[in-house]
UniProtKB/Swiss-Prot annotation:
It is found in: Secreted; Secreted, Extracellular space; Secreted, Extracellular space, Extracellular matrix. InterPro entries: Collagen, Collagen_Structural_Proteins. This is Collagen alpha-2(I) chain. GO terms for cellular component: collagen trimer; extracellular region.
Length: 1033
């Protein structure tokens, strides 16, 4: 406290004259320590000496460069402290905006599920949603039982220690060294023997619930996880109901007139009209234009031939008749015998036009007779307008030819029959009534293809057709564009507080160290998460603390849901070595006090002087290896407290026995050495007396006034993150959710007005099948439909093999500057991947909920006794994870006693994660035991419920202290220290609102009809009629 003890160094002899003689004395009392000189240069390391007797512990030397990282050691055997109370889950953050749904691709053919693909690189972190407010702190959970301790491995061989030389001047700090390459992994050794199980301790009484801490600022949301492997394609969906008939296509423009077809067969003459004046018998006229088939009438008798009259004047043109309804095609009639030609008579006058008689049924045509003499040409009737071209029908049986009237609109064009012989031109007859359609005849030969007619009038929309057979699944379409970020949803409701659980067992109550209590510093703002720093120095084993009295038991709460994995914190920097206090006499054990009520946490006290190393206590059985908790975020570092004045001097305690020396830790990067304050005067060392019994505890020291706060040094350099481990397999596939509702059907387009049809052209030979045209452009996006039902979550995949740790990167230079503002959390490092499960179906991703913020750190509990639970099984060595970001500098804890190796327990099943507790202060480090061989990894045990933290023990009697020197300025930060304890994971944010599944959009406008392709080969199916047309399915 007042300076260093240099009595172990060789002292020069002192001469003293006495009565003319001269004799030499031993070392005299040590004078006051002068101010510290400037640091000298670092000397070169000397050769390794032979192992000598263990000397007094020397002052810590400069930290050497970080060596290669060795294999992971066995799990520590520290006593499990009480877990803090669990906080209420935070209010969920607002979900992001829902993205625009991409275009639906074509349904692909279902392929066989492929092998799980290589896991892709982690995607870029998504945009952080607005953090939700942190909820109130929940009731403390019930403390879990201490599991069985893991086996202790065999102790490694200690390196030979050279003789301790005199302490040289402290040189100036050199530049940070480069990190060494990773060392080879050690081999597995034999498993140790199983030790006996100790008795279970009594259960503690129920304590009072703790007071809820204030609500802190919201934390940053966690980064997105790694992308999972794509799931196998699902089964093809059931074919949907057929859609409504699409709108009629727009007919193309009128094509050029085709070639004239062959002449039809000459039909039988129609019924005779009213008798005219007698004229000469005319010759048979040429066949007139074929009229449309009319309704069937009885066959009329042929009237007698009238006498030839004089040719009358041409009558007026008949009225234009409307197009008749299309009748079914009649059957082909048999060809009849053509009668002999009559003698030509004189042309008589045209008689009065009689009423049109009913058209008789078409008779069988007669055989063609001999050609008669040419008769006089008849009058040509006026030409009618050209009617629209209908679909080519099958030729019906020719009906009788009536008298030619005014030319009406052309009916449906039938297939032209074989060309018959040309007849003589005759007179134009009147147009008869349409007869009933005859039976459907056999199809005639193919006619010529006519030119495409103008657009027809809009047809009436047909009814919904019957569902056709399901076609083969289409090919998989291209993925649609990524949607934009959706709006943030409203925060969710506050969760229900958990029930009050039973209290956990009381922890042992430890003695308080001396030192004045300083005020608690304000919580600083959190700085940005830096990259992981290199491994720090491994600390020397500390002194064994005396067991403390038991504190009150905390009440237990129900375990909450497992929190999301936080960002792993880096290793904290090693703090400066405190001054070594003088050895005091051992006081007697104080009476054990009754547990007091839990008080509000007081301000943090200043760090006391380091005492002498006590004797190692009996080793209790090692506790079980707990389930590895998710690493929490690094909390903000508070400012340094003021150093208080020293308390009153107590009686010095007896010097404890030196504990077993642990294995040498790895060397970290050398940090610059801070200036040392002025030393106080050191008293002379007396001879060590025999160890007496422990005396009664002295009265508590007077609390001094807090000193001024020191400045915090700049953070150490950050290391480079190693490469991620190999990816794991995908998880199991979840159940497929039902399909969303179908969107509304689009409005049918309007058909343009129809134009007049063209004539039928000659039909060419069938061409080769044409190639498929390019797909039409996609229609507009449809309205969003109702959201589908959320499918059941997939089962969690099994834990996979660990990835190989990457090499530690080269550290950057040491930066000096004020702490920066808190930045967003970094991406999640590669963890242990699960075994490959069935691939889940890709669903709409929900918005990431923001992680809960870290609660205020609870007051530091006293160190408990070693547990005596059953021994757990040896676990397999875990993988070296990637180096996480550097955490805040934790206070260096006092080392605990060395525990003996416990027996190996059976592998327990992995239990569910316990509730998230608030982040506690960093505990005191225990003495490092002998290094054992890595055991097989056991299953994670059940995480117990947290108990209430025990109250602070009474302050012990302070040791003699010298006058406190002035506090020197804070030196630059040293290299990063060892990893701090894993923090409690943050609360899992609520799942985002699932976006609604978009509904099917309206149908796009129909494209223009393409040119008719050649008929393909028949593919089977069946014919059905619709609106008078025949279709093949």
């Amino acid at each position: 406290s007042g300076g260093f003890d240099f009595s172990f160094l060789p002292q020069p002899p002192q001469e003293k004259a006495h009565d003319g003689g001269r004799y030499y004395l031993g070392p005299g009392p040590m004078g006051l320590m002068g101010p510290r000189g400037p640091p000298g240069a670092s000397g070169a390391p000397g050769p390794q000496g032979f192992q000598g007797p263990a000397g007094e512990p020397g002052e810590p030397g400069q930290t050497g460069p970080a060596g290669a990282r060795g294999p992971a050691g066995p799990p520590g055997k520290g006593v499990v402290g009480p877990q803090g109370a669990r906080g209420f889950p935070g209010t969920p953050g607002l979900p992001g905006f829902k993205g625009i749904r991409g275009h639906n691709g074509l349904d692909g053919l279902k392929g066989q599920p492929g092998a799980p693909g290589v896991k892709g690189e982690p995607g870029a972190p998504g945009e952080n949603g607005t953090p939700g407010q942190t909820g109130a702190r929940g009731l403390p959970g019930e403390r879990g039982r201490v599991g069985a301790p893991g086996p202790a491995g065999s102790r490694g061989s200690d390196g030979s220690v050279g003789p301790v030389g005199p302490a040289g001047p402290i040189g100036s700090a050199g530049p940070p060294g480069f990190p060494g390459a990773p060392g080879p992994k050690g081999e597995l050794g034999p498993v140790g023997n199983t030790g006996p199980s100790g008795p279970a301790g009594p259960r503690g009484e129920q304590g009072l619930p703790g007071v809820s801490g204030p609500v802190g600022p919201p934390g940053n949301p966690g980064a997105n996880g790694l992308t999972g492997a794509k799931g196998a394609a699902g089964l093809p969906g059931v074919a949907g109901a057929p859609g409504l008939p699409g709108p009629r296509g727009i007919p193309g423009p009128v094509g050029a007139s085709g070639a004239t077809g062959a002449r039809g067969l000459v039909g039988e003459p129609g019924p005779a009209g009213s008798k005219g004046e007698s004229g000469g018998k005319g010759e048979p006229g040429s066949a007139g234009p074929q009229g449309p088939p009319g309704s069937s009438g009885e066959e009329g008798k042929r009237g007698p031939s009238g006498e030839s009259g004089s040719t009358g004047p041409t009558g007026p043109p008949g009225l234009r008749g409307g197009p008749g309804s299309r009748g079914l095609p009649g059957a082909d009639g048999r060809a009849g015998v053509i009668g002999p030609a009559g003698a030509r008579g004189a042309s008589g006058p045209a008689g009065v036009r009689g009423p049109s008689g009913d058209t008789g049924r078409p008779g069988e045509p007669g055989l063609m007779g001999a050609r008669g003499l040419p008769g006089s040409p008849g009058n040509v009737g006026p030409a009618g307008k050209e009617g629209p071209a209908g679909l080519p029908g099958i030729d019906g049986r020719p009906g009788p030819i009536g008298p030619a009237g005014a030319r009406g609109e052309a009916g449906n064009i039938g297939f032209p029959g074989p060309k018959g012989p040309a007849g003589d031109p005759g007179k134009a007859g009147e147009k008869g009534h349409a007869g009933l359609a005859g039976n459907r005849g056999a199809p005639g030969p193919d006619g010529n293809n006519g030119a495409q007619g103008p657009p027809g009038l809009q047809g009436v929309q047909g009814g919904k057709g019957e569902q056709g057979p399901a076609g083969p699944p289409g090919f998989q379409g291209l993925p649609g564009p990524a949607g934009t970020t959706g709006e943030a949803g409203k925060p969710g409701e506050r969760g229900i507080p958990g029930e009050f659980g039973l209290p956990g067992p009381a922890g042992p109550r430890g003695e308080r160290g001396s030192g004045a209590v300083g005020p608690s510093g304000a919580i600083g703002s959190r700085g940005p998460s830096g990259p992981p720093g290199p491994d720090g120095n491994k600390g020397e084993p500390g002194v064994v603390g005396a067991p403390g009295t038991a504190g009150p038991a905390g009440s237990g709460g129900l375990p909450g849901e497992r929190g999301a994995a936080g960002i792993p914190g880096g290793k904290g920097e090693k703090g400066e070595t405190g001054l070594r206090g003088e050895v005091g006499t051992t006081g007697r054990d104080g009476a054990r006090g009754a547990p007091g009520a839990v008080g509000a946490p007081g301000p943090a006290g200043a760090t006391g002087d380091r005492g002498e190393a006590g004797a190692a206590g009996p080793a209790g059985p090692a506790g079980p290896r707990g389930s590895p908790g998710e690493r929490g975020e690094v909390g903000p570092a508070g400012p340094n407290g003021f150093a208080g004045p020293a308390g009153a001097a107590g009686q010095p305690g007896a010097k404890g026995e030196r504990g077993t020396k642990g294995p040498k830790g790895e060397n970290g990067i050398v940090g610059p050495t801070g200036p040392v304050g002025s030393a106080g005067p050191a008293g002379p060392n007396g001879p060590a007396g025999p160890a007496g019994s422990r005396g009664d505890g002295g009265p508590p020291g007077v609390t001094g006034f807090p000193g001024a706060a020191g400045r915090t040094g700049p953070p150490g350099p950050s290391g480079i993150t190693g490469p991620p481990g190999p990816p794991g397999a995908a998880g199991k596939e979840g159940l497929r959710g039902p399909r969303g509702d179908q969107g509304p059907v689009g409005r049918t387009g309007e058909t343009g007005a129809g134009g007049p049809p063209g004539f039928t052209g000659e039909k060419g030979p069938s061409g080769e099948p044409g190639t498929a045209g390019p797909p039409g452009t996609a229609g507009p996006q449809g309205l969003l439909g109702a959201p589908g039902i959320l499918g059941l979550p997939g089962s969690r995949g099994e834990r996979g093999l660990p990835g190989v740790a990457g090499a530690v990167g080269e550290p950057g230079p040491l930066g000096i500057g004020p702490p920066g503002a808190r930045g967003p959390s970094g991406g999640v490092g590669p963890g242990v991947n699960g075994a490959p499960g069935e691939a889940g179906r890709d669903g709409n991703p929900g918005s990431d909920g923001p992680p809960g913020r870290d609660g205020l750190p609870g007051h530091k509990g006293e160190r408990g006794y070693a547990g005596n639970g059953p021994v757990g099984a040896a676990g397999a060595p875990g993988p070296h994870g990637a180096v996480g970001p550097a955490g805040k500098h934790g206070n260096r804890g006092e080392p605990g006693p060395v525990g003996s190796a416990g027996p190996v327990g059976a592998l327990g099943p992995r239990g569910p994660s316990g509730p998230q507790g608030i982040r506690g202060d960093k505990g005191e480090a225990g003495d490092k035991g002998p290094r054992g061989l890595p055991g097989l990894k056991g299953h994670n045990g059940l995480q117990g419920l947290p108990g209430l933290a025990g109250q602070h023990g009474d302050q012990g009697s302070p040791g003699p202290v010298g006058p406190a020197g002035p506090r020197g300025p804070a030196g630059p930060s040293g290299p990063p220290g060892k990893d701090g304890r894993t923090g409690h994971p943050g609360a899992v944010g609520p799942a985002g609102i699932r976006g609604s599944q978009g509904s099917q959009g309206p149908s796009g406008p129909p494209g223009p009809p393409g040119p008719p392709g050649p008929p393909g080969a028949s593919g089977g199916g069946y014919d059905f009629g619709y609106e008078g047309d025949f279709y093949r399915a």
